[in-house]
From Swiss-Prot:
This is RNA-binding protein Hfq. The lineage of its organism: Bacteria, Pseudomonadati, Pseudomonadota, Gammaproteobacteria, Enterobacterales. Residues 63-102 are annotated as: Disordered. Homohexamer. The gene is hfq. Coiled coil: none annotated. PROSITE patterns: SM.
Length: 102
């Protein structure tokens, strides 16, 4: 299963490391917003005013608020483990919008 995550892990790790605000759309249409605090094979820990554990099987799309360069991680940094933990990040004004439908 490591080959299937060869794009996913560097992308999520770049979002975590750079503390990029993200919108995560779930398969049921709910939109969550915040910063990726950490992730593993099955879940993403999303931090806004509170931390939420979001199961990856429930995620449809992850949309960063700005472009990130995630391919530069292939030359060695921090992808040796399947668990990535971020430092406790500075507070953001990101919020959860569970009622939004478009």
């Amino acid at each position: 299963m490591a080959k299937g995550q060869s794009l996913q892990d560097p992308f999520l790790n770049a979002l975590r490391r750079e503390r990029v605000p993200v919108s995560i759309y779930l398969v049921n249409g709910i939109k969550l917003q915040g910063q990726i605090e950490s992730f593993d094979q099955f879940v993403i820990l999303l931090k806004n005013t509170v931390s939420q554990m979001v199961y990856k099987h429930a995620i449809s799309t992850v949309v960063p608020s700005r472009p990130v360069s995630h391919h530069s991680n292939n030359a060695g940094g921090g992808t040796s483990s399947n668990y990535h933990h971020g430092s406790s990040a500075q507070g953001t004004s990101a919020q959860q919008d569970s009622e939004e439908t478009e």
